C-alpha cells in the first residue's frame, strides 16, 4: 500500500486495491477511503475522518502517519477501521470547501443542493460508512472521531462537539476525549447535518467532532501540538490503555440556542477576530437585526462559531451555557 495521503492528493489509485498485512487485511474503497480489518476477533468498529474541510491539514497528516505506521507494523490494529479523507476535491485546492460546506450536507442534506463534486462526495461518504458499519461484526461497538481544525482563535483551544442524540452518550468516548487533554466538551441541542450527526443518528455510533487548533497549509503544521490526540486515537485503534489527563478538569457546555440570520442587516457585537468562547452576560445584546435583537437572558453565555456573513436563514453562531 503506497502513501495514503499522497495517492489522495494526486487523485491516483494504489497499484493493488486490496491486500494482507501481518495482522490485518485492507481494501482501498475509493479516493481517500481505506478499510482495515484485523485477522483476530474485534469488538469495535471505528471511523477516523479528517479533511471534511479541505484546508484543515493537521488532522489529515495525523491520519496519514497513523496509516503509514499500521502498514509498517509499528502500530498494531485491534479494531475494524475506516480511514476517511473527506473532501479531496477541496484538499487539492487548499480550500475549506469549493462550492458548499460538506459538513452541512449529511443526513441527506446534499439532496437539497446543486450536484457538485462535493455534494456527490457527501453521498459517497454516507454510503461508504453505512456499508462499513453494516459489514462489521454485529457485536462491535461503533465509534466515529471526525477531526478538524478551526478557522478562528479560541479561548479554549481544543474541544469536542457531541451530536444531539436521544440515546445515552458513550462513557468510553468521553473518557478518550478527556485523556486527549481537550479543554471542553460541547453538547448539541438539536439535530444537524454534520458527519457525526449522520453516524450517531443512523448507526448509533458514539460520535464526536474534534476541533484541534488552527488551520494551516500542508507541511506547515507543528504536529507536536497534536501529540495528545494522536496518542489517544492510536491507543483507540490498538486498544491500549488511555493516557492520564495532564490538564485541569475538562469544561462542559450545552448549546442553549442558535443565532439565526433572518435579515440582510444582521450585526453581531463581536469583532471579526473575536475568539470562540467569547462571553456575554445577562442583558447584553449579542446580535441585532430588524426582525429582533438577541438579548442574553442567562447570567453568562459563551459564543461558538460566530459568523455574521452566512446566508439568510443560516446559523450565525451557537449560544452556550456551562454545565457546572
Curated annotation (Swiss-Prot):
The active site is at residue 211. Keywords: Arginine metabolism, Hydrolase, Metal-binding, Zinc. Its cofactor is Zn(2+). The keyword Zinc applies. InterPro entries: AspA/AstE_fam, AstE_AspA_cat, Aste_AspA_hybrid_dom, SuccinylGlu_desuccinylase. CDD domains: M14_ASTE. One of its GO terms (molecular function) is succinylglutamate desuccinylase activity. The keyword Hydrolase applies. Gene3D superfamilies: Zn peptidases (3.40.630.10). Its EC number is 3.5.1.96. Binds 1 zinc ion per subunit. Pathway: Amino-acid degradation; L-arginine degradation via AST pathway; L-glutamate and succinate from L-arginine: step 5/5. Zn(2+) binds at residues 53, 56, 148. GO terms for biological process: arginine catabolic process to glutamate; arginine catabolic process to succinate. It catalyses: N-succinyl-L-glutamate + H2O = L-glutamate + succinate. Belongs to the AspA/AstE family. Succinylglutamate desuccinylase subfamily. Transforms N(2)-succinylglutamate into succinate and glutamate. This is Succinylglutamate desuccinylase. It comes from Acinetobacter baumannii (strain AYE).
Amino acid at each position: 500500500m503506497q502513501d495514503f495521503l499522497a495517492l489522495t492528493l494526486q487523485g491516483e489509485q494504489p497499484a493493488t486495491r486490496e491486500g494482507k498485512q501481518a495482522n490485518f487485511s485492507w481494501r482501498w474503497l475509493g479516493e481517500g477511503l481505506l478499510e482495515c480489518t484485523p485477522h483476530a476477533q474485534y469488538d469495535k468498529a471505528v471511523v477516523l475522518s479528517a479533511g471534511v474541510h479541505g484546508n484543515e491539514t493537521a488532522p489529515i497528516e495525523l491520519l496519514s502517519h497513523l496509516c503509514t505506521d499500521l502498514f509498517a507494523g509499528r502500530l498494531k490494529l485491534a479494531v475494524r477501521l475506516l480511514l476517511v479523507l473527506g473532501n479531496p476535491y477541496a484538499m487539492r485546492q487548499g480550500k475549506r470547501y469549493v462550492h458548499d460546506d460538506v459538513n452541512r450536507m449529511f443526513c441527506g442534506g446534499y439532496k437539497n443542493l446543486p450536484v457538485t463534486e462535493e455534494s456527490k462526495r457527501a453521498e459517497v461518504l454516507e454510503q461508504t460508512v453505512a456499508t462499513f458499519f453494516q459489514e462489521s461484526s454485529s457485536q462491535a461497538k461503533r465509534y466515529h472521531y471526525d477531526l478538524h481544525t478551526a478557522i478562528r482563535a479560541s479561548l479554549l483551544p481544543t474541544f469536542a462537539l457531541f451530536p444531539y442524540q436521544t440515546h445515552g452518550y458513550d462513557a468510553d468516548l468521553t473518557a478518550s476525549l478527556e485523556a486527549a487533554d481537550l479543554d471542553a466538551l460541547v453538547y448539541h441541542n438539536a439535530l444537524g447535518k454534520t458527519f457525526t450527526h449522520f453516524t450517531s443518528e443512523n448507526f448509533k455510533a458514539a460520535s464526536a467532532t474534534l476541533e484541534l487548533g488552527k488551520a494551516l497549509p500542508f507541511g506547515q503544521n507543528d504536529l507536536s501540538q497534536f501529540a495528545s490526540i494522536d496518542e489517544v486515537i492510536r491507543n483507540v485503534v490498538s486498544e491500549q490503555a488511555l493516557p492520564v489527563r495532564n490538564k485541569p478538569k475538562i469544561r462542559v457546555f450545552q448549546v442553549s440556542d442558535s443565532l439565526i440570520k433572518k435579515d440582510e442587516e444582521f450585526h453581531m457585537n463581536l469583532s471579526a477576530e473575536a475568539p470562540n468562547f467569547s462571553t456575554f452576560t445577562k442583558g447584553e445584546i449579542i446580535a441585532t437585526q430588524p426582525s429582533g435583537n438577541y438579548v442574553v437572558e442567562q447570567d453568562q453565555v459563551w459564543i461558538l462559531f460566530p459568523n455574521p456573513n452566512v446566508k439568510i436563514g443560516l446559523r450565525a453562531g451557537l449560544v452556550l451555557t456551562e454545565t457546572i
